[in-house]
Amino acid sequence: MRFVYAVMTVIALLPAGLRAQQSYAHPELDLAVTYSAQRGTAVGGSSFWAQGGSAELSATVYHGLGGAMDIAGNRASNISPSGVGLTMITTTFGPRYTWSHTLRGEFQKRISLFGQTLIGEAHGLDSTFPSPAAAQSDANVFALQTGGGVDLAFSRHFAIRPLEANWLRTQFPNGASNIQNSLRFGSGLVFRLP
């Protein structure tokens, strides 16, 4: 008889346990629009700043883990003594981890810190890229971007990104090492999509 009572108790409690298993937070989807400034180095060792912007779509799906896709465009009018400019568009995607915390006080704000590693392609144009045959005005190369940032939410659907910093590695042909390491800084607005 005790066995029957035990089975009946398990059957009675089973729906509550199953209901608890089904309740989970829906994925968070963010769209960030940022101004970006990129510090790069030309072949002769001279440095330059490129300015532009980016649009980034990210989703957090499980305990801070998620993914991001970033499309950025930057332009420098003069990267070398000869006056050659550079326009670069990068399209990268990859994993992201986000840690969030609610700040207590008069104004309750949610702060989120994120770190990411994104890979993709960089398209350089309006410049000079050496090649075995002749110089070209554009090139498509591998791009690796890693870094992170801070988001400060003011409401459920709106946040600001006071700082984002990324290291960007590209492999444009330059007649020397064919490797460029740049730092990209950004700040802007984040829209949290329902």
Q: Which residues does each predicted region cover?
A:
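C-terminal transmembrane beta-barrel domains of outer membrane proteins
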Residues: A139-V141, A153-S155
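Detector for outer-membrane/organellar transmembrane beta-barrel domains
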Residues: A37, T90-T92, W167
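Cleavable N-terminal export/targeting peptides
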Residues: M1-A25, P194
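Extracellular loop and loop/strand-boundary signature of outer-membrane beta-barrel proteins
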Residues: G40-V43, N78-V84, P130-Q136, Q171-S177
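Gram-negative (and chloroplast) outer-membrane scaffold detector with strong preference
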Residues: E56-P132, V141-L144, R161, L183-R192
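Short glycine/proline- and aromatic-enriched beta-strand/turn motifs that initiate or cap beta-hairpins
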Residues: R19-V61, G67, T117-I119, R184-P194
